[in-house]
Structures are given as C-alpha cells and as structure tokens.
A protein has these predicted regions:
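Cleavable N-terminal export/targeting peptides
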Residues: 1-32
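Outer-membrane pore/translocation modules
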Residues: 28-197, 207, 215
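Outer-membrane beta-barrel "beta-signal"
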Residues: 83-85, 200, 219-231
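Alpha-helix capping and inter-helical loop/turn segments
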Residues: 203-205
Length: 231
C-alpha cells in the first residue's frame, strides 16, 4: 500500500510541476508539456516580455517572444524579438518533490530605442543568439530555482543570473489555489547591485500570477508582475 501511495504522490507532483514549471523572469526557461500552449507576460520598470510557447514532445518546447530591456540607470533600452527551443535534460523524483534541469537557446533580433537624455547606443537592427540553463526543485511546501540567461549580438552582450526561494504557508491540492511567498535575487550585466524582490505567487492548474516589489536601493519600489496561462 505504501508503494502504491508513493507512486501516486510522485505522479501528482509530476503533473503539478509540468503545469506550473517556474519561469520568468521570468522569463526564458519555461518547459511546456506536449501539445500544450502557454502564453505569458512579464513587466517591470526595466524589463517586459510577452511570449507564446508550445510543447512539441515530452521534453522539448518551442517559443516566440517580444521583449524590452533597460538598464537600472535608464541610459539604454533595447527591443528584441526572439525564438527559443527548450529541452528538459534531467529530472529527479523523490517521495517529496521533483528536480528539473533545462537548457534553452535560439536566435534574436534587437534594435535600440532612444533612452531619455541618452539617445540610442547603436543604430539599425542587430542579430544574434541567446541561451541559458535553468535548475529548479519543487515540493508542495518549498520551491527553489537558479538560472542563467545570456544574450549576444554584434552591438552588446548581456547576462542575467536569477535565484529564487519560496515557501507555501499552507499545503494546497493540485485542484485548489496554491500560494507561495518568497524572494528573488537577480543580477544583470553592468549593474552594481543585486536586485532583491520579495514576491507572492498564486497558481491553480492552468494559470499563474507573480507579484512583488523590489527593495534594494537601485530598484526600490520597482513593481514586478508575471502572468501565465496554459491551454
């Protein structure tokens, strides 16, 4: 009986993990189950993104998205269009939770937008690539994530590192609304401070909402919102 219960519990955790696999900064690294479509949007004062992804196999998804990036000093701003393939390269189950490892990469096109008082840092459209790695571990009570995402064109190179840690104040079944509270730490190229953002996550089956406010000096009171829906 214990063995049957344990296997059922792992299957439930696996279903939950695939439905709510963490993102985004947000953003890149989402894994989408086969034949599932995901639409998401993320916005902060220095970043925004909209993306649509589709799961083509059990361990591979593809995506198209549009994003905007601004540095903390607001001295330059880029708009990008990207395509992406995400591959699940490792998954570890135990009685309490699931660990996942993803890699992702794809082409991008970027152009500079005039920043107030600074102008553009390059002209025309520049083409390049982006890639990254995403590691996470989840139980019904705890969630942790570490990711790296790099962008490269002839005009700029940009890296972003994110760590997240969350805890659920109560245990929720997969059919119910679940709540996590936690903190995100993000470090971006050429920025002297790590952006620290306490935030709240709500999710249920096919939808997900993140909301938080940054507290470090360079990003103080910057609001972070991330929305996701699968169908």
């Amino acid at each position: 009986m214990k063995s049957i219960y344990s296997h059922a519990r792992v299957r439930t955790l696996a279903a939950a993990a695939m439905a709510i696999a963490a993102t985004f900064n947000a953003h890149a690294g989402f894994f989408i189950p086969k034949d599932t479509t995901m639409v998401m949007g993320m916005i902060t004062p220095t970043e925004s993104m909209t993306e649509t992804a589709f799961g083509i196999t059990r361990d591979t998804s593809v995506a198209l998205g549009v994003s905007t990036m601004t540095n903390a000093a607001r001295s330059y701003r880029w708009q990008m269009v990207h395509a992406q393939a995400t591959k699940l390269v490792g998954r570890v189950f135990n009685e309490d939770g699931i660990g996942n490892a993803y890699v992702f990469a794809g082409p991008l096109a970027a152009r500079a937008v005039e920043a107030r008082g600074y102008g553009r840092d390059f002209d025309g459209t520049r083409y390049g690539a982006h890639a990254g790695v995403w590691l996470d571990y989840e139980t019904r009570r705890y969630y942790g994530r570490a990711s790296w995402h790099g962008y490269k064109t002839s005009a700029f190179a940009w890296n972003e590192t994110i760590t997240q840690a969350m805890v659920a104040p109560y245990l929720a079944d997969y059919e119910d609304v679940a709540t996590f509270v936690g903190v995100q730490a993000k470090r971006r190229t050429d920025e002297p401070q790590t952006e620290v953002t306490p935030y709240l996550r709500l999710f249920k089956k096919t939808w997900w909402i993140d909301a938080g406010v940054s507290v470090n000096r360079a990003h103080r009171r910057d609001v972070f919102i991330n929305l996701m829906h699968t169908f």
